[in-house]
Amino acid sequence: MSNCWCFIFCKERVRSNSSSPQHDGTSREEADHQVDVSDGIRLVPDKAEATMATASDEIMHQDIVPLCAADIQEQLKKRFAYLSGGRGQDGSPVITFPDYPAFSEIPDKEFQNVMTYLTSIPSLQDAGIGFILVIDRRQDKWTSVKASVLRIAASFPANLQLVLVLRPTGFFQRTLSDIAFKFNRDEFKMKVPVMMLSSVPELHGYIDKSQLTEDLGGTLDYCHSRWLCHRTAIESFALMVKQTAQMLQAFGTELAETELPNDVQSTSLVLSAHTEKKAKVKEDLQLALTEGNSILESLREPLAESIVHSVNQDQLDNQATVKRLLTQLNETEAAFDEFWAKHQQKLEQCLQLRHFEQGFREVKTALDSMSQKIAAFTDVGNSLAHVQHLLKDLTTFEEKSSVAVDKARALSLEGQQLIENRHYAVDSIHPKCEELQHLCDHFASEVTRRRDLLSKSLELHSLLETSMKWSDEGIFLLASQPVDKCQSQDGAEAALQEIEKFLETGAENKIQELNKIYKEYECILNQDLLEHVQKVFQKQESTEEMFHRRQASLKKLAAKQTRPVQPVAPRPEALTKSPSPSPGSWRSSENSSSEGNALRRGPYRRAKSEMSEPRQGRTSSTGEEEESLAILRRHVMNELLDTERAYVEELLCVLEGYAAEMDNPLMAHLISTGLQNKKNILFGNMEEIYHFHNRIFLRELESCIDCPELVGRCFLERMEEFQIYEKYCQNKPRSESLWRQCSDCPFFQECQKKLDHKLSLDSYLLKPVQRITKYQLLLKEMLKYSKHCEGAEDLQEALSSILGILKAVNDSMHLIAITGYDGNLGDLGKLLMQGSFSVWTDHKKGHTKVKELARFKPMQRHLFLHEKAVLFCKKREENGEGYEKAPSYSYKQSLNMTAVGITENVKGDTKKFEIWYNAREEVYIIQAPTPEIKAAWVNEIRKVLTSQLQACREASQHRALEQSHSLPLPTPASTSPTKGSTRNVKKLEDRKTDPLCLEGCVSSSLPKPPEKGKGWSKTSHSLEAPEEDGGWSSAEELINSSDAEEDGGVGPRKLVPGKYTVLMDGEKGGSDTLAMRSGDMVEVVEEGTEGLWYVRDLTSSKEGWVPASSLATLLGKSSSAQCLSSSGKTHCARQLCPEPAKILSPEPV
C-alpha cells in the first residue's frame, strides 16, 4: 500500500509546491501542446516521499509484511492465538493464546505466519513497547505448558514485554508446575520474562479486566469471526485503493504523453477514447468509496446497537484507517476531476481548433476558386442581350457563392468567439479570422466591380441599341414613304413633317458626342466594343445624312409646287429611268412580299413589300436597300440567338431538375422500380448536346452577331458535332417507351412541381428533335436576305448539310427498325437512300410460272441502299402510340453492289427501273412512287457504281505501274489492235493469279502512238479485277436489244457519229492534242488510229486528238435501254477497253 500513499502524499506535496516561483515560471507554450499534471495529480510512485507518512498508518507496512488475512484465513480460523484489542497498563498490545489442546500439532509454518501477521497489525509505536502474551493452560499439563512457552519464546517475531501463563488448575499438575518452574526459572528468564499465574484474579493484577476477554474473566467484547471478517474487508479495501491508484497513475501517464492530433477525426477519436477511460476510472473510484463506506458502517455497527458498548483500541484503529483511506480517496477523486477537467478542456479546444482549421481550408479553397472565376469574367458583352445574360449569370453566380461567403463570415465569428473564450491557440486563430474577413471583402468588392462594369456595359449597349433602333426606324420610315404621293404639295409637306418629327427624336435616341462616350465608358471599351461603337455611330451619321438628303429633296418638291406647273413633254431619259408600274408587277411585288412572313413581324413585311415595288420615282439608293436587308438579317440572327439561349436554358433545366435528381438520395423513394438505373435511356445523350451548345455553338453564334450573313460558317465548322443528334434520335423510341411506362411516377410530378413547369418532361425531351429541324428554317430565312452577301455560299452549303443530317437521322430511324438481318449493318457502309417501292422479280433460270406471276403481282418492299449492298425488306405496320407506332422492317434479301447493274428505263414507264444481278441472272423491276424518286435513286446508284469503277481503275493502274517496272515487255509482233488485244487477253487468262494491267500489254503490242497522243496515254486502263472478285467488269454497257446482251462478239470500239461527253481530265501532250476537262461536250470529226479520235469542243470550238476511251456517248432517241453495271459475265472487249461509268441523258445528234 506504500505506493498508494506515496501517490497521495506526492499529490499533496505538489499542491504545497504549486505556488513556488519555479512553477509560476513554467512555459505557457508547453502547456498549449501537452497535458500538464503538475498542478493536478502525480501518479509516479516515489519511495523517498513515502517516509512522509504518519507512523500510525498501518496500511503502509503491507509492502514489508505481505501477509494478509485472506492469505492465512484458514490458519487464523483455528484461533490458537488472537489479538483481542486489549492493552496493558503502558499500552502494550495483548496477544492471547487460549486453551488449544492440539497446539503442539500446529505446523511451524502456520504458527510463524499467524505470529507474524498478528504482530504486524498494531502500529509501530505500540509494537515498539512490546507485546504481552497471555497463555491460558489451565486445562493442560505442565509438559505442554513448558513446550508452548518455549515454542512461543523461540518463534515470536516481535518484542516481548511480558509472558503471563495461567498454569494448570489440577492439584497434581499445579504442584508439578510449581516444582518444575522453580528448578527451571533460570531457563525461562533467559528467554522471556514469564509469570506463572495460578488464577484469573491474579491475572487481573497485571492486566485490567476491561482489556481481557470474557473467558479470562474480563469484560472486553471480542468475536473472533467478526474480527477476521473486518480484517479481511479492511485489507481488501486497502488493496482496492492501491489498484485504483495504480490505474490512475497509468491513465495519468497516458494522458500526459498524448500528443494533440492534427485532424478532426483523430481528435474526436482521442477525446472519445479518453472520455470512455475516464468514465471507467471514475466507476472504479466510486466502487472503492462505496466499499470503504460499507466497511466503516460495519465497524461502527456494534456501537450503534448498544450505547454502553466499549470499543477497544484495535477497533478504533481500524475505523481510523478506513476513514483515512476514504478521505484520501475523496481527495484523489477531487484532484483527478480537476486534472481531467483541464485535460478535457484541452482536447475540446483542440477539437474546436481542428474544426475551425478544416472549415478554414474548405472556405478558403471555395473563396479562392470563386475569386479566380470572378477574375476570369472579363467579358463585357457584345450586345444588349448578351450583357443582360452576363448580368443574370453574375447574379446566379453571386447567389451560389453567397453560401460560401456566409459560411466564411460565420466561421470568422466562430473564431472570434474562441478567442474570447481564451482558447490556447489564439495566435493561430486570430490570423485566420483576419484572412477570412479579407477574402470575403475582396470577393464582395470584385463582384461589385464586375457588376459595375456590366452595368456600364448595359448602359452603353442600351445607348447603342437605342441608336441602332432609331437608325432602323429611320430607314423603315424612308423606305415606307411612297414617292408618288410626295409629288404633290400636300404629300411632300406631310412627308417632310414626318422627316422633321423623326429628326426631333434624335436628341433622345442617338449618340451625341463620340468623344464623350469614349471618356465615360473607357473602363469597358475593348477593341471589339470600340469598333461596334464606331459602326453604330457611322450608321447613325449615315442615317442622318439620308434624312437630310430626303429632307432637302422634299423641301424642293414642296417649294416647286408653290408655282404653276407648265405642262411639258416627258423626256425619254426620264421614261426609261422611271417606268410606270404595271398591275402585274404590283401584284408580283405583293406576292413577293407575302413570302417574308417567316419572321411574323408586320412592319418588316410592310418594309419588304415596299422595297420590292418597282422603283418609279424613288430616290432611295442601293445603300438603303442593303440597310433594309441588313436589318432583316439582324432580326433573323436575333431570333436564332434568342431561341438558342432559350434552348440551352431548357436543356440545363431538364438536366438539373430531372436527370440530376435521379441520383439524389432524398428523391430515391419517389423513383419507381421500372425507372431505376435507366437515366441514360430516358435522357439519352442530352448532356452531350447541352455541353456542345452551351460551351461551343452558342458562343460561336454570338460572335456572328455583327455579321449575321457569316453564320453559315458556324454551322459548317461544327457539322461533325451535329451528328450527336442522330444518336439522340435513335434512342428516342426507347426513351418514349420508358416515359409512357413511368409517366405517372411521383418523381416526375415532384420535379415538375419544383421547377414550376406547366409542361411535363416528355415535352422537354422532344426539344432536341425540334431544335435540329428549326435550324434549316432559320438558315433558309437568312439565305433569303443574303443572296448577294459574302457568306451566301456558306449559308447554302450549311443549309444543305443540315438537311443532309435530317435525312441521315430519318434514315437511321428506319434502319434501326430492321429485324431479321444476321450481319452487322455497319459493315454495309453508309446508308444512302431508303424508301418503299413495288417490286417484280424475274429470274433467268426460274420456272415459267414464277416469271408470269411476277409480271402481274408486285411485291411491296422497302429498299435500303448502302454503299456496299442494297437490302430488300418487308414493311410491317405496328400498333401503338408515338414511336411504338413506327413501322418495322423484316429483312428478305440483299444484293452486293459489286455485282449489281441498273437499267434506267423499262418499257417507257417513267417510274420504273431495273436492278439486275450477276449479269441478269436475277432481275428486279422497281416502280417508284414518283418519277422524281426514281431519278434520285438511279442517280445515287450510278454514283455508287461509278465510285466502284474509279476505285478499280486506280487499283488496276497501280498494279500495272508496279508490274511494268518488274516485268520485261514483249516486242510487238503485229500492228493490229485487235490481234494484240486478243493475244494479251490470252496471256491474262493464262495467268489468272497474277493479272497484268492492260495498259502495259497494249502499249507493248501496238505501234507507238503519234506525238499528239502523249497527253492521253494514261487513260487506257484494264479493269480486270482479282480472282475473288468474280471478274469485275465495266460499269457501263450499251445494248440495242436483249440479244446483244448475250452476244459473244468482241472487237474494238467503233466510231458512232454524234456528240460525246468527256469522262476524265486530260492535259495537252502535243500540238495536235486537245486539253479537256471532265464534263465537257465534244463532237467527233474523224476517227484516227491507235484508239484516238479527232474531236471539236462545242464550247470553245477548239479541235484536237483525244483517246476514244475517255468519251461517253450521248444517244439520241432510241428504244434501247441504258444499263449501268458493275459486275457480270462480260466480254473481252469490255475487259480490254472498259466503257466509261457515267451515262448522261440521251441527246439527239
Curated annotation (Swiss-Prot):
InterPro entries: CRAL-TRIO_dom (IPR001251), CRAL-TRIO_dom_sf (IPR036865), DBL_dom_sf (IPR035899), DBS_PH (IPR035534), DBS_SH3 (IPR035532), DH_dom (IPR000219), GDS_CDC24_CS (IPR001331), PH-like_dom_sf (IPR011993). One of its GO terms (biological process) is intracellular signal transduction. It holds the Pfam family Spectrin. It is a peripheral membrane protein. It comes from the Eukaryota. Residues 1055-1116 form the SH3 domain. Highest expression in the brain, where it is found in neurons and alpha-tanycytes (at protein level). Detected in brain, and at lower levels in the heart. Residues 632-812 form the DH domain. PROSITE patterns: CRAL_TRIO, DH_1, DH_2, PH_DOMAIN, SH3. Spectrin repeats lie at residues 355-454. Its main location: cytoplasm. Residues 555-627, 956-1033 are annotated as: Disordered. Residues 503-528 form a coiled coil. The modification Phosphothreonine is found at residue 622. Residues 830-946 form the PH domain. Mainly phosphorylated on serine. The modification Phosphoserine is found at residues 457, 462, 471, 480, 621, 1033-1034, 1041-1042. It is found in: Cytoplasm; Cell membrane. Belongs to the MCF2 family. Interacts with GTP-bound RAC1. Interacts with CDC42. Interacts with RHOA. Interacts with CCPG1, which results in specific inhibition of its exchange activity toward RHOA, but does not affect its activity on CDC42. Guanine nucleotide exchange factor that catalyzes guanine nucleotide exchange on RHOA and CDC42, and thereby contributes to the regulation of RHOA and CDC42 signaling pathways. Seems to lack activity with RAC1. Becomes activated and highly tumorigenic by truncation of the N-terminus. The CRAL-TRIO domain mediates interaction with various inositol phospholipids, such as phosphatidylinositol 3-phosphate (PI3P), phosphatidylinositol 4-phosphate (PI4P) and phosphatidylinositol 5-phosphate (PI5P). This is Guanine nucleotide exchange factor DBS. It comes from Rattus norvegicus.
